[in-house]
Amino acid sequence: MVQAPVARPMTFEAFLEWYPDDGRRYELIEGVVVEMLPTGPHENIGGFLGAELNFEIRRSKLPYSIPRTCLIKPQAEGSGYMPDVVVLNRELLKQEPCWPAASVIQYGATSPLVIEVVSTHWRDDCGHKFVEYEAMGIAEYWLVDFRALGAVRHIGQPKQPTITICQLESEEYQMRRFVVGEKLISGVFPHLDLTADAVFAAAGSC
């Protein structure tokens, strides 16, 4: 992850106008533009999860779609996030003011699930994004820590590859951890047949 020098904090609107068409991924974190530089294994997992969820969407005939890229505009000023996987409710996209012109959502109901594959900058995934997705009312947030990078308070002891599924209940996330040998349980995809083992194996050689 590379942080671009800025003279003053950037607004989300300025970030959206600035965003270059260079094939790279950028996020805005507290007014600072950050280039995301995911590893190959990181991208493998994101692609695998997107494919698995797309299959489940078709199989269960759900009104969802997964865009190739999508920016999430949280309530906090000066921030904009690009999760590894964003599941959108197609029926609610009409309420998104930016959607006709840009792949941007700002209402939590539009995205029932977002997934972040944890990187070396796990504090953003477990900190800023956790708080902001919760405040937006995004029903489910997955943290896929396939390299066990997060703090013990997030992934438990002993540290091991962990998928934390955060489900919104009474406006607060309730967290459940899944490790090797366990099947994932999702409220958004109740019939999903997916294990933590399969997700971690998708990374390939790390």
Residue ranges, per PLM feature:
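Gly/Pro/Ser/Thr-rich low-complexity, intrinsically disordered segments predominantly at protein N-termini
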Residues: 1-206
